[in-house]
Amino acid sequence: MKELRLFLRKIDQKVISKGKHYLLTLIILYRYKTNEVLDHYKEQTPQKEEPIGATSPIWVCWWQGEKKMPDIVKVCYSSICRHADNHPVILITEKNFQEYATMPDFIMQRLYKREMTITHFSDLLRMNLLKRHGGIWLDSTILLTKDIDSIINTSLPYYSHHHIPNNCNVVKGKWTGFFLACGKGNILPSFILDAFYNYWKNNNRIVTYLFIDSLFALAYKHIPAVSKMVNNIPVQPMSNLSKCLNQEYDKKAMETFYTLSLIHI
């Protein structure tokens, strides 16, 4: 009886979660007029899709700069540099981001007034960089144990870590905002960036923490060119090292992590 109650509780949680995501998507789509941005992209079929490229930049952001990185971030950043193959690693900071990305004044005002957090600003930043330059975005807390080109097919126009989900959020394992790559001018970051701009022109507070994933979900559902790119990426394993942060180091456990997955978060 206890097992049945636990099972039904899990089912209820999944139903409630899916309902919340669905309602939030409708709010973003119609109340905040994202549907108007979608209309511009729905029927777009790129004539020539730029590949990610074997020498495209790897973008990593730590706002305060490398010297202010916590130890765990330094280790992750070092692993990215070590496994970058022929990709130059560019660290984006508060001091240099304007060398690579141009943001509208109203976005910068939202940031300076603290109406927008640095975390959310980094979502806009990654889409801006990928649209303008192409390349590979890696969050600064990703640990690589294999060379990047053994994970990504750089001849493709798009990559994100397609994985088996461990929860029922809007992502459904089809993509990750923390590991995303594409060629210059790709339709996905172009749409998401325009949708962000459209929202922040008229709002001074984020509608949801996972706003980027909600926009990704809308792109996947309504833009055939996006769903085609996403569905073309095979499922890959991903380990969650964050669950082990407070545990004593175990060499065998780490070796197991290394064999099960190529990236670790």
Regions found by a protein language model. Give the residues of each.
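Glycosyltransferase-associated regions of secretory-pathway enzymes
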Residues: 1-122, 140-263
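Small-residue hinge/turn detector
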Residues: 123-133
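Short aromatic/hydrophobic "clamp" motif used to bind/position activated sugar donors
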Residues: 135-137
